[in-house]
Design a protein with these regions (language model features):
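Long, contiguous binding/interaction regions
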Residues: 1-88, 96-196
């Protein structure tokens, strides 16, 4: 079995999307909720899959009124890498502070946090995030408020998750340390669907 990436044929035309958008958005809101985890008050992980990425691409094409093949292919090339490959989980990490001044200061103190997020399969070592591949996510002063993370699992971990063992998720940064052990069964089961 191979994880399918999106193609031009897996997307709807702008006209068709306009007709189904309201229904699809409602479905995606529920789907995304089942794949989201909050770590404390200020950090959220949104685990991606083909459906969440299809929604993002459809929305971008709609907003930009893109219908030419070249523009569609460009969006697919940008977003397909965010779909899990069958041996990993991929997520968008959001660092959220409502006050702009507080956010600026916190992003300074949280520099490097993207490398301190982990997933652990029960009975195994932590799997640390591989963050922002091919992207600059911080500068000398601060981290970014949005990061793209990948958690690469070995064959034994994948088999264990398919067998039904628990899973935990956390972050171990000196300025922000939170864990959920175990994560909800609903989240765990949704993420296991990403694995081959």
């Amino acid at each position: 079995m191979e994880i399918q990436k999106l193609t031009k044929n897996s997307l709807w035309t702008l006209e068709h999307y306009a007709r189904v958008r309201d229904k699809f958005r409602k479905e995606m809101i529920e789907h995304k909720k089942s794949r989201m985890v909050r770590l404390g008050e200020n950090l959220t992980l949104h685990f991606e899959d083909a459906q969440t990425i299809k929604y993002q691409v459809q929305e971008i094409l709609r907003i930009e009124k893109t219908f030419e093949e070249e523009g569609i292919v460009d969006e697919l090339e940008a977003y397909n890498p965010l779909i899990p490959d069958g041996t990993n989980f991929k997520c968008t990490m959001m660092i959220e502070f409502s006050d702009e001044a507080v956010r600026r200061e916190k992003l300074k103190s949280l520099k490097g946090i993207e490398d301190k997020v982990w997933v652990r399969v029960e009975g195994r070592d932590k799997v640390w995030a591989i963050a922002d591949e091919d992207l600059a996510s911080e500068n000398d002063e601060k981290t970014s408020a949005v990061h793209f993370l990948r958690f690469e699992l070995d064959e034994d971990m994948i088999k264990s998750l398919h067998y039904g063992v628990g899973m935990s998720i956390g972050v171990d940064h000196t300025q922000y340390s939170v864990s959920i052990d175990p994560v909800s069964l609903d989240l765990r089961n949704n993420l296991v669907k990403d694995l081959i």
